Amino acid sequence: MSKKPPNRPGITFEIGARLEALDYLQKWYPSRIEKIDYEEGKMLVHFERWSHRYDEWIYWDSNRLRPLERPALRKEGLKDEEELFDFKAGEEVLARWTDCRYYPAKIEAINKEGTFTVQFYDGVIRCLKRMHIKAMPEDAKGQVKSQHPLSWCCPIDPAGSCNQSMGSEDWIALVKAAAAAAAKNKTGTKPRASANSNKEKERDGGKWFKLPSKKAETSTCIVTAEIEKKEELPTSSETFGLHIDTVPKIVFPQPESTLTNKRKNNQGNSFQAKRARLNKITGLLASKAVGVDGAERKEDCSATAPVLEQAISPKPQSQKKNEAVISSSANTQKPALLSSTLSSGKARSKKCKHESGESSGCIKTPKSPLAPELIQAKDLTLVSQLSSVINKTSSPQPVNPPRPCKHSERRRRSQRLATLPMPDDSLEKLSSSSSATDGKAFSISSQNQQQSSVPEVPAIAYVPLQKLGPCLPLDLSCGSEVTGSRTPHPSYHGGECPREEKEETPLFANPTSKVVSDVKGAAAATGISKTEKKVKLEEKTSTAFGKRKEKDKEKKEKRDKDHYKPKQKKKKKKKKKSKQHDYSDYEDSSLDFLERCSSPLTRSSGSSLAPRSTFTEKTTTYQYPRAILSVDLSGENLSDVEFLDDSSTESLLLSGDEYNQDFDSTNFEESQDEDDALNEIVRCICELDEENGFMIQCEECLCWQHSVCMGLLEDSIPEQYICYICRDPPGQRWSAKYRYDKEWLNNGRMYGLSFLKENYSHLNAKKIVSTHHLLADVYGVTEVLHGLQLKIGILKNKHHPDLHLWAYSGKRKDQDQAVAEAERKITPQDRANSEGKECVQNHKEPALRMEETYITSEHSYQKPQSFSQDCQSLTDPGSSDDDDASSFEEDGELRVPDKSHLLYKNRGVSEKNPASGNKVFVYNDKKGTEGPGDSHLQWQLNLLTHIENVQNEVTSRMDLIEKEVDVLESWLDFTGELEPPDPLARLPQLKRHLKQLLLDVGKVQQIATLCSV
């Protein structure tokens, strides 16, 4: 009786269906159903990209199975009666704003793609999907027009202007009422000063600064400051630097009783919170414009140029002397100059840094220029007109967020600004940012001066404003502290800053002396020609080089004199050697032929520099946040990856004097301190990237750890130290940790107990290595014989489908020549070619193409379609050595006659080329031209020739193995350790010894766990 699979949402119980399954290591992997057993109620699950040996039978109701894409079950219950409503144009609805709250709105149009163009009750037009619109209750439909008269009673005509039908007296009265209501709100309820309240206020307030647009909108982050304090300051239109004639006037046709009684209405309490916040902002803006003469009207603005929102910051009291200049410039501004102002402003603010955690709040800006009918040429709202007027007299400022200063002395990793090629507008950034540190947010008169000399400004390529990322906020209530908080303050360049800050920015070494206090001075700095800039930049960079060298010398002297600072352990980088085992001191000369070149798979310093080298192409003078620069390489979170400057090789190269002198190990360590200054990465278990106290370096990934965190002291550092990540790589199988534990395979050394005077593995290392080589040769021969059996089976079966793979005619090549050609194509590596001995050391060789020469491998039989997968398993760090037993382990045209040669390459053991005169087949691209009758015979002939060659290879290898066994036996007989071969008599003793050894190892493991150093 067959059982029916359970109903599990997202899982299809059929063969080939994909899902996620939990393996025995408690990790989820995408999987596939291979078989289904309806009787037992379980399925054979295959983990994708893993070998089939890990396929597992899992019950179909097990919690180890889950859908590949989790369905959102909560959305299925949201289907209510809302779908029954068919909205029409002009209908009043509740539309959702960006704060996920619903506010009254009116449908303007229904688009073809199923979206609705709605106008909110405050005049903002947005394009929303059907899911963001609700039907308005019947009892609330008639209340909206009387509650908020701003946009419902001032309809928007096609020209984009607001029809004003009443006099300015009602408007002034309404403004006073709004100001009184806002003041009453402030005294009644004390505003919260938390970041969340500021964020919420600016998010809702940002809707007022938004221009109507039917197009998609992007949100750029803004920086919030003490808005509450700024709101309480009594300001007027003079604070903005605007003439009294330039402030727009808006007529509100409803009396003030409508606005004051608005909060008492209980029927509209669902959107009462937003109205209160908007009234607060309205009252604030109204209090700033109370002194406006209501009889005068502002002349027509430019309806063609798009009004872009820029940073507006009121000037401090110390700058009131420039109000006359500012107001006159505001009157003389023409709409035709707006585009040139924006372009020059863009050129000055060419690079805008990403804020690293300082942004709190978002504001909406149009992604593209607005449609002409949506641009309000006259007075739609007060804020939009204020922004359009003040934007003509303002320009964006380059933003330089201060880097966080750390009190602890950190090692200099790079000097970016002093040596990188700086763009031409860097001096403009310098002048503008230094003036911003003095409290001046921006200068309008300097903008006028720049506009008057627009042709003289050098043509600097600039990034469009939409691509600048977070720009300065459009916030009328923010003061100069907002801009000041995002520019380098002089206190950040004091004594508590790290040394790298001073070295890399010599231009800002004394910012107080560089501050341009006069507005004309800042404008003059922006008008410097290219040649003067280049000359000054060359002088600055040359002085920066000199300063850096002097500081390097001072650092060296200070290190020698400072006896209290613990010496940091600097391990020498291991240089690749062609030989690690030297048997010259041994008495027996017959062991000389056992010399093999081992392949220590130590990662070179270049591999640790690989992620950094990708950033050297960028010549920008700013630093990305560390969160963006974090690179994940097999679990290594390189959070300190920074730019390398062009002079980084200067400290890495020894000068002529240092080349000639013979320096001891201490001098080498000191010089290596300078070499590794740019390469050091601190990756400790404590997750702090600071160098404190005694540091130890991993010999594989060259990362540094605190010895205290690792539980090691200065006198207990092992000879070979490998960090915790290299020993147990995250996201990989357990067997991956043996890649870095190669001492046992290469040198025959194992870790011993510290209380023992003699280590057995150290005393008998040569014997252990010879035994390892012997076992590797035997293992390689067994694999060759297995492949030979498969090929003999093909030869016996005339109708085997894979017999045609031997249809190529071949020519012979010397094996040494083939190996040499392959090594020329492989990445540069250390080779030791002496007397026919070959050594392949690099285990990360690129997998080359092997379409038609795969049959030269005599140890394995495989279809050609799986070449890419097998080669990928070699280069993939996530795959283990024993992932696929039948995989080829060849590299392109590397014609080595046994798999063990490349097997040793992967496992850290390399073998000598056993027979230098052997030949292998390298086939041509030509296919056989025989007829169909002779084809099978020719294929069998080619295969037979190949099998004979492989048998000859096996014979020569067996001779080599026999010699190795003879040498090993004579060696053991010479030392007296060879006992008569009676394994059956010693079997019980061997079992007892193995059992006791396991018990002892378990005790040692418990001791190490409980008694950590």
From Swiss-Prot:
It holds the Pfam family PHD_5. Residues 879-892 have a biased composition (Acidic residues). Keywords: Acetylation, Isopeptide bond, Metal-binding, Nucleus, Phosphoprotein, Repeat, Ubl conjugation, Zinc, Zinc-finger. Residues 404-415, 566-579 have a biased composition (Basic residues). InterPro entries: Agenet_dom_plant, KDM4-like_Tudor, PHF20-like, Tudor, Tudor_PHF20L1, Zinc_finger_PHD-type_CS, Znf_FYVE_PHD, Znf_RING/FYVE/PHD. Its main location: nucleus. The keyword ATP-binding does not apply. It comes from the Eukaryota. GO terms for biological process: negative regulation of proteasomal ubiquitin-dependent protein catabolic process. Residues 11-71, 85-141 form the Tudor domain. Residues 183-206, 309-368, 389-454, 482-511, 533-585, 824-911 are annotated as: Disordered. The modification N6-acetyllysine is found at residue 905. GO terms for cellular component: nucleus. There is a cross-link at residues 75, 79, 530 (Glycyl lysine isopeptide (Lys-Gly) (interchain with G-Cter in SUMO2)). PROSITE patterns: ZF_PHD_1. It is found in: Nucleus. CDD domains: MBT_PHF20L1-like, PHD_PHF20L1, Tudor_PHF20L1. A zinc finger (PHD-type) spans 681-729. The modification Phosphoserine is found at residues 368, 432. SMART domains: Agenet, TUDOR. Is a negative regulator of proteasomal degradation of a set of methylated proteins, including DNMT1 and SOX2. Involved in the maintainance of embryonic stem cells pluripotency, through the regulation of SOX2 levels. Interacts with methylated DNMT1 (DNMT1K142me1). Interacts with SOX2. This is PHD finger protein 20-like protein 1.
